Amino acid sequence: KPELEWEVDAFWKKFREEVLSEIASGAKVSMELRVSEAPELRRELAIQVKSEIEAQGGQVEEVTVLSAYKQGLLWLMEQVAPVLENLPVATVELGWKPFPVEIPTDQRFQGEPARWLNELYPADDLLAGQLGLPLNSVSFFMQEEGESIYSVTAKDSSGAVLLQDSFSPKYYERPYFDAFPDYAQVTVTTGWLKATVDEVTLVDERIATDSDRIWDYYQATTLEEVYDEIKSNTGGKPTRDKAPYFHTLRVELKASEPDYKLEIDQEHISVLESLHDDIYFDTLDFFYEVAETAAGGDAPRSRSLAPGNVLPWIHPERRGQPPELTITYSGFASKQPKLVVRYREKENEEYETETRVLAPAEIPEPYIYLAEVKAGEDGLARLGFLVTLEDTEPLPRLATLLDNLQRLQDEGLFTEALGIRGAAQIVVRLEAPGAVSTRTYASQPAERSAAPSELYRSRLVTWDHVISPAESEIISHTLGTLPNVTTYVGGYSYQGRPVSVMEIKLPMEAELVSQAKLNTWKPVLSIVGRQHANEVSSTSHILRLAELMATDPQYQSYLKRMNVVIQPVVNPDGASLSYELQKLTPTHCLHAGRYSALGPDVPGQVNNPDTLLTEALVMRDVSRKWVADVRLNPHGYPSHEWVHQFANYNPKSFRSYWIPRGWYTSARVIEDPRLKDYNDAALAMRDYIAEEVSKDPQVRETNLRIYDRYQRWTMRWQPHLYNLEIYRDTAIYHSRRSSSVSVPGPEALIRPTVFSGSTEAMDETAQGPWLDLVTRMGFGYLMASVRFLDEAVYSLYRMEGESQGSVRISLTRPRPIRSGRPGSGNQQ
């Protein structure tokens, strides 16, 4: 917990020691200060500075206190716009200088050429609104000449110049990582003080902002100490296979930094949010580099690395006080599980301790060798599993383990272990060369549907608030009491939270149902939500669809043509964290909750049977159980500008997400005649999506406005990085941008899923009316897929055969299904 000086205190010390003390009676004083503080505090500072100058006998010529964050934008709005308000302005032209980019370069990344333009965002909307001008009256141009980074020219309706001015931000360069200085250099805007007395410059130097001081400490002290610790714990080689390196790196911050909303959609000014994102993403980058360095540069960079839980915990603005930084690093209690027993004998007063390391047992995959039925009894009387061992060495240990499980169950513990629905007893048979050991257990499966406090009575899912994982569980299991919904806990997350699955289909009387038949008789729609758990709207519209299909006859009718499987929250650990963080800063993006509790993306662990992220195994199990015809994975992204101050301003690994571009999705095709059914489906889905999403007038108007803003600020200047494809007033990416395309392999021709879709909604973090709006966008997308499946064309083939006195009957549904929309394969 370091003692960090407040930037304003640093200013006062320098000003009073080096400027105020030099002011003689009648001296003319000018001062410009740049600090990273809220506008109200900066105005108070200016008043106080003037007062102290006058008390010293000086004459104030000019005192200006500007923002050290987004310096160009706030110079325009606070210094230029008030002057223009009193003039007959017809047009405003804003010039900006390109940010220098070196090609070729040894740096891992650089700033964007339009970086200085980006720092003006959203100046055109703000200026037009403040001056009462049409939006197209404010224009930008790239300027190569002149010393200043920015220029502004205001003209009247005749073209006469009313105002011309220029401005440059103050900035410095630093390494992206102190520990790896060759990785990249970044340019960071900063604070400054310039003071003149009687035209003599007394001070013209940097005043480090609070965020500068915080970041310097975090890089030079925290990350260096953490790096030393994990090297010590890994024998000097913190390679990827030795991760996770730690349990939690928590960075709690209270600071006097600007954090306020702009009157443009969900845009805001927030140094605090930027610090959250730098702490989170830059730290993950740091550990990627740690692993790569340990591997001699051969480690692939991947989001699958699980360094540990990086947790920025940022409090709301604490105006007018020094920053309070508390950093907590915690490792794991033990490198591997241990059983420690401390005991003493009755006759002995001294305690003794025994420690045993618990190594995992290497158990081969069991096979079913026994399925016993009895006349007049439902289900299986016994279900037997055979474990075949190569030698006898592990047999006693496994037998003891099974005996201990029996003893625990006799005491009422772990009663659901080895519980399988539809079987009365479970038999476990261990076979080794020359030895056999068998145990029998009562099968006590967990209830598939949790008992809610009350049955479903009225609408549960509303779109006026963020749904927490706990609320999602209540909703899911309450809906599970209805006839056509089966809700069960598919597994548990790394931190022990339930991951529930909802299966929605027409009611069935039988307790045992063939999964093969469910996959065959009707198409399957599979939907997952909150993979990136701070993208909050997906759970809301997914659960609402589930509720309607469970309770509304109109929506229930769709179940005649499809089965639906839903995972409302596949990343409950991240969702729980982001839910708690939004209580502090409700509209921040809260990316610390994006990935899992250990850092990697959950789906990246689906095919890793040894993963620590057990929530990924639920996704794996559901995808194996339900062979989906359509898969949907709705996502989200920031609802406002996304800034990384210490990574050259724009989000380093997510450049195209810098500002909102409205709701969007993709329906891509590969020009290959062998993939006609898949391409036809994508073309049909494009129409269904446009119809369902943009039929809401407010959704359509909002998206078109933000699409236009995105084009003005990004595509015009850097089309290689930013693009949009608008189809029927909806952003749906369809065309290839690359000049080449990979040739699809054989697996592309046999995949059963005809359409896999993802979306991006402006929902990090949406609240209130904005959450309702973006959730309506997502619900329209779900309904597009429901309509597609409802109208799809598919066939069922019944085949019968007789052989050696037995009759075989099979039912087959060829895949992929085909679009039922006439002419879908001929759309342009």
Please place each PLM-identified region on the residue numbering.
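Active-site/substrate-binding loop(s) of hydrolase catalytic cores
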Residues: 519-524, 536-680
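Soluble metallo-hydrolase cores and metallopeptidase-like ectodomains found primarily
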Residues: 458-527
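Generic recognition of flexible, low-complexity loop/linker segments
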Residues: 487-490, 512-515, 555, 618-621, ...
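Short glycine/proline-enriched loop/turn "hinge" motifs that connect secondary-structure elements
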Residues: 513-520, 591-595, 746-753
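C-terminal accessory segments enriched in acidic
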Residues: 1-461, 618-628, 640-828
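Short, conserved catalytic or adaptor-binding loops enriched in Gly and charged residues
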Residues: 475-481, 557-558, 592-595, 748-751
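Short active-site segment of divalent metal-dependent hydrolases/proteases
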Residues: 533
